[in-house]
Amino acid sequence: MVATKSVLSAVALAGVAAAETIDVMVGQGGLKFVPDNIKAKAGDEVVFHFVMGHHDVTLGRYDSPCMPIQGESIWSGVVDTVEKGKGVTFTVPIHDDKTKWIYCSVAKHCQNGMSLVINEPSSGDNQADYKDRAKIVPQSGSPTQVKGGTLGGSGGSGGSSSSSASSSGSSSGTTSAPTPTGGHSSSHPSSTSGSDSSNTQSTPDATLIPSGSIPSATGSGSHSSTPTASPGAAAGLKGSAVLAGVVALGAWIGLL
């Protein structure tokens, strides 16, 4: 019994070790899957790396180029590498050795040759014939839900740069505006509602003064330039001046 378990474990480990990861570049060099003809067995994974442009990975039928298989779909959804950034992947696990026809359903990409075959038959159905018949398909089709694989890589941020300006339409006077890439710099924030904060020059940080510490006005239309000293404070100042004079006189006499 123990020997049987050991044999089964060894077989299982051998199967795991034999599994391969096959990398395919999507959009590299144009409307292409690179490579576009691969072999994969049960247990392998095909990782599609979106390199450039707007593309998707769709499982289709040989007899209906550029059209998806209903009920047995593989679809990555359309990936925009311009917005999401490079590094987005779609990993498809392979469960059998059947032939699979993959294409890009975006616009006329399939019609222009953007397709791939996994486990192409040694005779009969072939990729060259698939691409020829795809040229006359009026419009490509795709599923409506991501299925058959897992999206990963760096596309989770959605492509938004953390340094991009707010789209609220108004700039805040309490935050430093970003340095503009062109045009004239401005040392004053714009007072126009809806102004773009990206057009203002970065200003030095200001120290905020509590409103209670600002001296009150001494008369209509004017503010006191200096606060009024209290009698006690004035007496203290005079005493300090007399003491300083005595110290200075003593020092002078000592020099004599």
UniProtKB/Swiss-Prot annotation:
Annotated segments matching region Disordered: 135-235
Propeptide: 234-256
Lipidation (GPI-anchor amidated alanine): A233
Positions with biased composition (Low complexity): 160-204, 215-235
Protein location: Cell membrane; Secreted
Keyword Secreted applies: yes
Compositional bias of kind Gly residues: 149-159
GO terms for cellular component: extracellular region; plasma membrane; side of membrane
Keyword annotations of the record: Cell membrane, Glycoprotein, GPI-anchor, Lipoprotein, Membrane, Secreted, Signal
Main location: membrane
Membrane topology: Lipid-anchor; GPI-anchor
UniProt signal peptide: 1-19
Protein name, entry field: Extracellular serine-rich protein ARB_03024
